[in-house]
Amino acid sequence: MYFAKEDRYEKMKYAYCGNSGLKLPLVSLGLWHNFGDHSNLESMKDILFTAFDNGITHFDLANNYGPAPGSAEKNFGIILKEDFGKYRDEMIISTKAGYTMWEGPYGDFGSRKYLIASIDQSL
């Protein structure tokens, strides 16, 4: 079981994101590489735990991150559920959509149908 370091917020500087009132760490962790199904889940945990222990609270995903597409979100979800759950409210988790995800005319880019389906799948 993972327990975050108590001094984690002393190790990072945070700044407001525009006029939103939301503070973000000056460093975020993107999960494009090393979080797909080709990677070891324990290595993913080590990366995430080290980042969080050093005050990184923003994790950036996308619906097509992998490989395979979608696997980074799936793997992050597993770790969030199994190890990070009690810290969820201390995190900002962002995702985005726009690249090809499935066959047919609705599987890519920015149509309303594509974006709603991508958001549903990301949740």
List the predicted regions and their residue ranges:
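Glycine/proline-rich, positively charged
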Residues: 102-123
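Generic beta-strand or strand-like secondary-structure segments
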Residues: 75-79, 96, 114-121
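N-terminal binding-site loop/beta-alpha segment at the start of enzyme catalytic domains
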Residues: 1-92
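Substrate-binding cleft and catalytic face of glycoside hydrolase catalytic domains
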Residues: 96-102
